[in-house]
């Protein structure tokens, strides 16, 4: 689960992570009031008005602006709130800005990057720091890897003090700045572990001319599998920032990711789903989604899966690929038949069932009287999808 920048900063602040003072505003008038409050209480020369969407690259897209007065803050908020912001992460459709963060301006001397996430290749959390603040870390890793330090964190002992100091040394900091950076990194790690985050990224981490070390931006992603331990974070979810198909799928506990193709996929198991998508691509098609109905697919989940796939108007054919290990193929076949009778299945549906009770399932489909196209293997299924698309 992703959250907004201001929400992430509120959480980090509770763990002692230094962040600038900021106030969220849902209207231009609220933005003006927030700016007045910051100017009066902090005496800062400028405030920063930042569009709040679940995407990076806001600054380059015009979603981050400076204001020197409450009146200017009002004008900028009028421009931002309600606009569709398009960045390299939003795609061409962009995201609507529904709120802004009004934040005190910083007297920046240096910019860095610091992030903590899970390294799946080593099954350890990894602390990453870079001297290239404000840059995409993937680009830094590819083009100038010498400017990126990765420190593997032992899951038994957690991050040690010497590792935080190593990171601060790598950034070239000294004296008070060094000590502040060590404290910052330590607090960030404690927050990351305590909230069961999948990612805690500060880009940029800034050092001010006064020697302060603060998170100018903050990106927090939660591990969905651990959210049951943090019910206080459920209210932070903003479904307006999520794909509506994915939101609907999550209500039925379906693992769904929308793509930009025209072949709907319903598969049990993530590995088989990815293999199915590859075969569709190799046959000349383009998958419209990733949909894993799970190892215990029931008629209800199959029906919900069909509804979600059919709600995507780009879908021109559907491929159902089920391997019956834990799940019985006849149960899935029953779900397909039931769904087809309830829903207007006006698209060609190619079905490949293998494994437990597959012959029974195939007979059920044959006897159903429905216009379902049977496939004998994955390659055959992908080919029949292409034939169905060509005929439509």
UniProtKB/Swiss-Prot annotation:
One Gene Ontology term from the biological process aspect of the record: tricarboxylic acid cycle
Gene Ontology cellular-component annotations: cytosol; succinate-CoA ligase complex
A matching Pfam family: ATP-grasp_2
Cofactor binding description: Binds 1 Mg(2+) ion per subunit.
Signal sequence coordinates: none
Record-listed substrate binding positions: 268, 325-327
Ranges where the ATP-grasp domain occurs: 9-248
Binding site for ATP: 50, 57-59, 103, 106, 111
InterPro entries listed in its UniProt record: ATP-grasp (IPR011761), ATP-grasp_succ-CoA_synth-type (IPR013650), ATP_grasp_subdomain_1 (IPR013815), Succ-CoA_synthase_bsu_CS (IPR017866), SUCC_ACL_C (IPR005811), Succ_CoA_ligase-like_bsu (IPR005809), Succinyl-CoA_synth-like (IPR016102)
Binding site for Mg(2+): 203, 217
The EC number(s) this enzyme carries: 6.2.1.5
Cofactor: Mg(2+)
Function: Succinyl-CoA synthetase functions in the citric acid cycle (TCA), coupling the hydrolysis of succinyl-CoA to the synthesis of either ATP or GTP and thus represents the only step of substrate-level phosphorylation in the TCA. The beta subunit provides nucleotide specificity of the enzyme and binds the substrate succinate, while the binding sites for coenzyme A and phosphate are found in the alpha subunit.
Protein name, per record: Succinate--CoA ligase [ADP-forming] subunit beta
Organism: Pelodictyon phaeoclathratiforme (strain DSM 5477 / BU-1)
